[in-house]
């Protein structure tokens, strides 16, 4: 590779396809962190959530605002087909040495390595650069392996992670130039626009690169993205021998979004479909872990004061974005967006579901920092009939947890009750309100 070829690759890797867009909180935090070369900045998240876009915007800021020479920024996207043959430690080192030949020694050096997980031995390269230079190092990846490898363990606290989610509902509205209501009058003025966009958000999610596409193209983009995640990030990466099992597992999760399930239940379901006869719950468990490593799905455990029950096999699985669950029921779409809101505003390890010995279920239990417990029920259409059932469940939860009780909430999308009265000790809140900043 010549320096001219490298310069062209860097230019193409760092090119912004469009200017503007909303300013995400991650962007501000990343800019602040760029002041000092250490620690290493690691950006993780599902494919197409905006990781590369954040790097590209920082690249432009460094050049256009901070005056950093373009020759001092090595920006490599390892999904570029020109770098497929360079996805090894020796080639990466050679590219780095070539890059250094034109660096301006009076300015800092920046190393941007996008989708680094494809490079065999990348950990040793980054560790060497970190230990021997004052370069600013940024790496991105669509696999949690980045932070579970020996690399992150050996570096200890010398890594600063930015985990990127798809757009929140607030960001989704901002991307369509809809302001966030600050008072009841603004809510009244903007209600129809917010309701329309919320229905879109619930159905198709908030992946930045998909939200502006026509509906038919959204589905095509979704299918292409799922195929890439399943084939490249799981089947190829982990060298799976039975790809049909993984695809059947994905379909199960999509059709049963938010259901309580175990590896054994899922294995039995897939076998009962007829195509796959031999499938162990151990294999299902391993494949579920692979999907979680791609950030595609997340699992929550049952809340219990008994450690054994918390670590039982019975979990609820959700997708990181609703574009991945279009085959689910509308009720499950709503529960999935509420889940994604809750893990943004809470420590994900403190988000659970609740279930008693008679099978009565609370959709979400939040353990707060003061150890108080919030209970949240999600109801797609609130009617006179199901209101009583949802209230009984929340009241039962409050009786079980009197000494630690926090808030009780019933989140709904449509209210079809004949009488819309308030309920003592329980907050009824429309989902579009729940997902926006509270004033």
Question: Residue spans of the language-model regions?
Answer:
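Interdomain motor-coupling "hinge/lid" segment immediately C-terminal to the ATP-binding subdomain
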Residues: 2-6, 150-259
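Short glycine-rich substrate-engagement loop in P-loop NTPases that contacts/grips substrate
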Residues: 75-106
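Hydrophobic anchor at the beta1->P-loop junction of P-loop NTPases
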Residues: 43
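Hydrophobic positions on the alpha1 helix immediately C-terminal to the Walker A/P-loop
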Residues: 54
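N-terminal pre-Walker A segment at the start of P-loop NTPase domains
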Residues: 1-31
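Conserved lysine of the Walker
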Residues: 51
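Domain-level recognition of nuclease-like catalytic cores that cleave nucleotide substrates
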Residues: 413-439
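Accessory nucleic acid-recognition modules appended to NTPase machines
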Residues: 215-373
């Amino acid at each position: 590779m010549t320096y001219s070829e490298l310069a062209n690759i860097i230019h193409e890797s760092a090119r912004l396809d469009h200017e503007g867009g909303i300013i995400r909180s991650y962007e501000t935090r990343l800019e602040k962190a760029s002041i000092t070369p250490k620690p290493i900045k690691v950006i993780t998240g599902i494919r197409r959530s905006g990781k590369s876009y954040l790097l590209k915007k920082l690249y432009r800021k460094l050049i256009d605002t901070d005056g950093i020479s373009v020759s001092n920024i090595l920006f490599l996207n390892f999904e570029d087909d020109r770098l497929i043959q360079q996805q090894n430690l020796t080639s990466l080192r050679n590219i780095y040495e070539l890059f250094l030949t034109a660096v301006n020694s009076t300015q800092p050096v920046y190393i941007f390595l996008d989708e680094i997980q494809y490079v065999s031995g990348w950990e040793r390269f980054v560790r060497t650069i970190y230990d021997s230079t004052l370069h600013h190092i940024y790496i991105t990846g669509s696999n949690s392996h980045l932070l579970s490898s020996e690399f992150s363990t050996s570096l200890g606290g010398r890594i600063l992670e930015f985990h990127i989610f798809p757009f929140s509902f607030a960001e989704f509205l901002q991307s369509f130039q809809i302001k966030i209501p600050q008072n009841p009058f603004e809510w009244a003025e903007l209600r129809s626009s917010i309701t329309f966009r919320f229905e879109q958000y619930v159905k198709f999610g908030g992946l930045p690169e998909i939200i502006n596409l026509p509906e038919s193209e959204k589905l095509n983009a979704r299918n292409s993205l799922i195929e890439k995640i399943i084939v490249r990030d799981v089947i190829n990466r982990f060298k799976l021998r039975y790809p049909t099992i993984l695809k059947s597992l994905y379909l199960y999760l999509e059709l049963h979004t938010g259901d309580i399930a175990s590896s054994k239940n899922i294995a039995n379901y897939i076998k009962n479909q007829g195509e796959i006869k031999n499938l162990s719950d151990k294999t299902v468990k391993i494949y579920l872990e692979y999907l979680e490593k791609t950030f595609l799905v997340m699992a929550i455990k049952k809340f219990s004061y008994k450690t054994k029950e918390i670590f039982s096999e019975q979990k609820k699985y959700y997708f990181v974005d609703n574009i991945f669950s279009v085959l689910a029921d509308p009720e499950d779409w709503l529960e999935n967006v509420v889940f994604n809101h809750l893990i943004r505003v809470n420590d994900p390890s403190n988000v659970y579901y609740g279930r008693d010995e008679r099978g009565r279920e609370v959709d979400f239990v939040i353990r707060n920092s003061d150890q108080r417990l919030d209970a949240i029920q999600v109801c797609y259409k609130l009617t006179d009939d199901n209101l009583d059932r949802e209230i009984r469940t929340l009241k039962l939860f409050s009786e079980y947890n009197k000494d630690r009780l926090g808030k009780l909430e019933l989140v709904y999308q449509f209210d079809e009750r004949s009488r819309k009265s308030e309920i003592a000790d329980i907050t009824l809140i429309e989902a579009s309100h729940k997902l926006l900043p509270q004033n």
